[in-house]
Design a protein with these regions (language model features):
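Alpha-helical transmembrane segments of multi-pass membrane proteins predominantly involved
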Residues: 1-280
C-alpha cells in the first residue's frame, strides 16, 4: 500500500513543482519517488500481510511483480523522453498525469475487490484521456482523445454491467467470496453469473486492445503523442492483462471450461486480424 500512497503524493508534488517553475527538479524528484515506491513493493515481497483495508487490495507476489514492472517501464519512458518533455511547455502536467495513471495501474495489479478494479481502471484511463489530446492544436490528437474517451466509456459500461451481474449472483465484490460461490455451487451457478463473466471479458479485452474490441487502437495510437503511445502500449497493457489474469486465474479458475474457449477464440481472431490487417511496417 505504501507504493500507492507514494505515487499519489509524488503526482501532487510534481504538479506543485511545475506551479513554482522548478522544471529542473521534475525528473530527479520523479525518479526518487519511483525508487521509493519500488522499495515499498520489495519490502512487501517478504512481508505478505494478506488483503488490506477490508480485502480491498492485496500486494501478493503477483501484484508486486506486475507493479514493479509498470514502475520500471514508466521510469525508463521518463528518462528516455527527457528531451521530448523539454520541447513542450506543459512538462509538469505530462509527468503528473502519467504518474496518476501509473497509480491506477498499480491498483489494477493489486485489486482484491471489484470496486478497486473499477477505481484503478478509471484513474489509469482518465489521465490518459487528457494526455492523448494534450496537443490542443493538433486535430489528430483531438480526434484520438475523443475516440479514446468514447470507447473507454463504452467499455466501462460493459465492465460495470458485468460486475453488477456477478454481484447480483454472489452478493459480494470480494474475489475470495466470488471464488467460494463458484466452488460451493458447481452445479447451481446462476445464469446471471455466466452473463457477468462474458461482459467482464468484453470490458477488459477492450482495455487490452484484443480483437474484435481493438478498433480504437490504430487511430488512438497514431494520433496520440509518441510518448503517450509508448506508455499506453506497455504499462496500460501490462496492467490490463494483470487485472484480467488475477480474476480468471483465481476467482474464476473453477469455471475454466466455460471461459477458456472464449479466450481461445479472441486470441485466434487477434492474431489473424493483426497479421492480415496491418497497414504500417
Amino acid at each position: 500500500m505504501g507504493a500507492i500512497i507514494t505515487l499519489s503524493i509524488l503526482a501532487l508534488v510534481v504538479l506543485y513543482l511545475g506551479l513554482f517553475k522548478a522544471k529542473a527538479l521534475l525528473l530527479p524528484v520523479s525518479i526518487l519517488g519511483f525508487l521509493v515506491a519500488i522499495g515499498f513493493l520489495l519490502n512487501d515481497w517478504t512481508a505478505d500481510k494478506g488483503p488490506l483495508f477490508s480485502g480491498m487490495v492485496h500486494f501478493d507476489h503477483y501484484a508486486i511483480a506486475f507493479s514493479v514492472l509498470c514502475i520500471v517501464v514508466t521510469l525508463c519512458i521518463f528518462i528516455i523522453s527527457k528531451g521530448y518533455f523539454d520541447e513542450g511547455g506543459q512538462v509538469a502536467e505530462y509527468y503528473s498525469l502519467l504518474i496518476f495513471s501509473l497509480t491506477g495501474a498499480v491498483l489494477v495489479n493489486s485489486y482484491h475487490n471489484f470496486s478497486m478494479l473499477f477505481l484503478g481502471i478509471e484513474i489509469m484511463s482518465v489521465a490518459l484521456y487528457i494526455l492523448v489530446g494534450i496537443r490542443k492544436r493538433d486535430k489528430a490528437s483531438n480526434e484520438a482523445a475523443l475516440k479514446y474517451f468514447l470507447m473507454g466509456a463504452f467499455s466501462t459500461g460493459f465492465l460495470l454491467f458485468g460486475i453488477a451481474l456477478l454481484y447480483g449472483a454472489t452478493g459480494s465484490f470480494d474475489l475470495d467470496e466470488i471464488k467460494a460461490y463458484v466452488v460451493n455451487n458447481p452445479h447451481a451457478i446462476s445464469p446471471l453469473f455466466y452473463g457477468g463473466i462474458l461482459l467482464l471479458i468484453v470490458g477488459l479485452t477492450f482495455k487490452v486492445g484484443a480483437a474484435p474490441f481493438h478498433f480504437w487502437t490504430p487511430d488512438v495510437y497514431d494520433g496520440a503523442p509518441i510518448l503517450i503511445t509508448s506508455y499506453m502500449s506497455t504499462v496500460v497493457k501490462v496492467a490490463s492483462f494483470a487485472g484480467l489474469l488475477r480474476l480468471f486465474s483465481y476467482s474464476l479458475l473453477p469455471l475454466q471450461d466455460f471461459w477458456e474457449p472464449v479466450f481461445l477464440i479472441i486470441a485466434i481472431i487477434t492474431l489473424f486480424i493483426g497479421k492480415i490487417g496491418r497497414a504500417h511496417v
